[in-house]
Each structure stands twice: as structure tokens, then as C-alpha cells.
Amino acid sequence: MKKEVVVIGGGIVGLSCAYSMHKLGHKVCVIEKSDGANGTSFGNAGLISAFKKAPLSCPGVVLDTLKLMLKNQAPLKFHFGLNLKLYQWILKFVKSANAKSTHRTMALFERYGWLSVDIYHQMLKDGMDFWYKEDGLLMIYTLEESFEKKLKTCDDSGAYKILSAKETKEYMPIVNDNICGSVLLTENAHVDPGEVMHSLQEYLQNAGVEFLYNEEVIDFEFKNNLIEGVITHKEKIQAETIILATGANPTLIKKTKNDFLMMGAKGYSITFKMPEELKPKTSSLFADIFMAMTPRRDTVRITSKLELNTNNALIDKEQIANMKKNLAAFTQPFEMKDAIEWCGFRPLTPNDIPYLGYDKRYKNLIHATGLGWLGITFGPAIGKIIANLSQDGANEKNADIMLFSAFFRD
């Protein structure tokens, strides 16, 4: 039997696509190779950080990263080798680190950040139950130079709240005297990504969306300019529309004769319990070492580190130890009780712009990947964009694709 819409990938982007397609009245089937219980979306920091925050590739990032490498505090770790794509990625990353590109990207972040926030509100109205707080993102600065640089960008719009080192401790009780101060970006929010994923899965299942868990897509059957069949290790599935949202895994993208400039960036998190009085009052980011610390219902999560050009899916204990060491330099001693360590791969483009839109060869294939560390931030917005695109029928008819897709960005 031919299915109307097949979404390949059960992460936040895939589920968001299924959610918005269902809202338009489509019959949707989600195919996910795992049991859907612990993918990369679950290990996310949970930041909805679209507002007044620069992308990874921004002016000064290259020099700052080199300085942090010397201190072993750099957020990016490159495993250099014979992979040509890595060097192409680095070159594009460096070229994107300019004021013009950053200004445009931040404007797009705001546009699609508000769309995501609206959709999170709708999900809650739909009866989903997940930890969601609109209480800002606290940017904590440990270098006077970067703190002063940030202060110059702050205006009196209400989107910023400048805090001294002493005032910062009211929001982050565990920081020590090695910090310079902080800026609360008031428009940002945070969620518990695991709760979002479970709530979204439950809602979609109850709404009649079909889920094929533990079923891996291994190939496609092509006929002329269409994908005639989706081949899993169990069966062949036909579909009118196929949405490919497989995150950092490039295997199926390559099956469609594409090779996007996107790297699987290995990220780490540690989730633990700590005394309530010591927990951060809102989501926080140690800006100079790119380490997020996010309060949740019963736990706290720290996330950091992005390793490029590695396929090793095991947790690197040295990286975990390095995260703890970097955090300890700016906090008072505290115990991470019942700590759970995690790592996973994020689909990272060099300029934080995702690959969205219809495939150039196959007319019933839509791509939705490349959000990197911003999956929770923009996943709901991407789902809405893709659903609208399916109605428009062509990339050029959809303004959001033209604005926010790497297919149309130099």
C-alpha cells in the first residue's frame, strides 16, 4: 500500500515535520532505525537560543578558538586526516566568520526562533506536557575583553539585562570570582529535550501517525525523477512524499547522489542532580568556553565540545574530564550526583544554515537536515517550513526555503 508521507528519521526535526504535516491533514509514517528512546535530540542542551546570540561562525571566532586550543578549552576539536570535506568545511567556516554573514544569520535566527516559540506554545495547547521555561539565556563571561565586546552590542530594548559578577551569582549560585559578569538575553527559553521528544511521540501516535521503530532504511528504488520505493531491512515502502531527516548520518543522502557540506559533530553532555539552592535559575552559557548549563525539572545538564571528523561513537573520558575541569575553573566545588554521561552526533554545517528543500533530482524527496547544535531551537520551525513547502510544490515558491536553506546560500 502506498503511503502519503514518509518521514525518515525520528529526531526533533523528523517529529516536527510529522507534526506539521499531520496538522495539514496528511497521513504520515515515521521510520526510525532505533527504538526512538535516546537519539541525539535527547542529549541536547535544550536551549531555544535564537535571540541576540551569534552563530558558531562569527567575527573573531578563529582567533578565539586558537587561543582556547592552547588552554585546552576550545569548543571545537578537529581530528585532522585525509578527509577533504573537513578542509572544505573549515574553509567555509572561516569565510563565513564575517560581520555581514553574521548579521544576516542572526536576523534569520530571530525570524525562525519566533516561529519555533509559537509552535512550542501550540504543542502545549495541544496537551503535550514538557518542561518549558521562557526565562532567558544567561551569557556568562570569563574574559573581560569578550564581556566588554558583548556590552557594546546591548541596547535598551529590554532584550538584554546586564549583570555584574555579584548579580550573576543570584542566577548562577555556584559561580566563583573568576567571572567578569553576564548578560541575560531575555527573549530566549529552554526545554527538557527528552520530555519534548516523548510528548511529541505520544501526541503523534495518539493522533494516528504511524511509527516504524527499529526499522532501518538501507536504500531507495529510483524511477525516472522519482523515488519509487523506500527500502528498509524488512520491506519496500512506497510514498507520495518522502522527507529525509536523518541528522548527521550521511548514508541515505549519498544514496540520493548528494554530498552536502555537513559534518557529523560529536557533542557531549553530563546530566546530574544537585541541591536545589545551587541549581542555575535559568539556562546559562559560559560564552568564552562554549559550555551550556541548563536546569530541568529534577536535574541539571551541562553540554559542551564538538569533535569533527570522527566516527567513534564511544564516550571519550578525556573529553568528559576536560568538560568538568573547564567548568570547575569558574565554579565553586559541587557534587554531580547520579551523573549520566552521553555523546552523540549533530549535523553541523559551516555557517549554521540547514539544508532544506526539494531535491534537485527526485521530485518527491524533501531534505530537512543540518541544524547542528540548534535542533531544539529550530526543529519546530523547520517542520512548519517543510509542511508549507509540500503545499507549494517547489523550492522557488517558498520564501522561507529561499531565505533559510543552504541550497540558496553561498
UniProtKB/Swiss-Prot annotation:
<keyword id="KW-0274">FAD</keyword>
<feature type="binding site">
    <location>
        <begin position="9"/>
        <end position="14"/>
    </location>
    <ligand>
        <name>FAD</name>
    </ligand>
</feature>
<dbReference type="InterPro" id="IPR036188">
    <property type="entry name" value="FAD/NAD-bd_sf"/>
</dbReference>
<dbReference type="InterPro" id="IPR006076">
    <property type="entry name" value="FAD-dep_OxRdtase"/>
</dbReference>
<keyword id="KW-0997">Cell inner membrane</keyword>
<dbReference type="GO" id="GO:0005737">
    <property type="term" value="C:cytoplasm"/>
</dbReference>
<dbReference type="GO" id="GO:0008718">
    <property type="term" value="F:D-amino-acid dehydrogenase activity"/>
</dbReference>
<dbReference type="GO" id="GO:0005886">
    <property type="term" value="C:plasma membrane"/>
</dbReference>
<protein>
    <recommendedName>
        <fullName>D-amino acid dehydrogenase</fullName>
        <ecNumber>1.4.5.1</ecNumber>
    </recommendedName>
</protein>
<comment type="function">
    <text>Catalyzes the oxidative deamination of D-amino acids. Has broad substrate specificity; is mostly active on D-proline, and to a lesser extent, on several other D-amino acids such as D-alanine, D-phenylalanine and D-serine. Mediates electron transport from D-proline to coenzyme Q1 in vitro, and is involved in the electron transport chain from D-proline to the c-type cytochrome in vivo.</text>
</comment>
<keyword id="KW-0813">Transport</keyword>
<keyword id="KW-0472">Membrane</keyword>
<dbReference type="Pfam" id="PF01266">
    <property type="entry name" value="DAO"/>
</dbReference>
<comment type="similarity">
    <text>Belongs to the DadA oxidoreductase family.</text>
</comment>
<keyword id="KW-0560">Oxidoreductase</keyword>
<keyword id="KW-0249">Electron transport</keyword>
<keyword id="KW-1003">Cell membrane</keyword>
<keyword id="KW-0285">Flavoprotein</keyword>
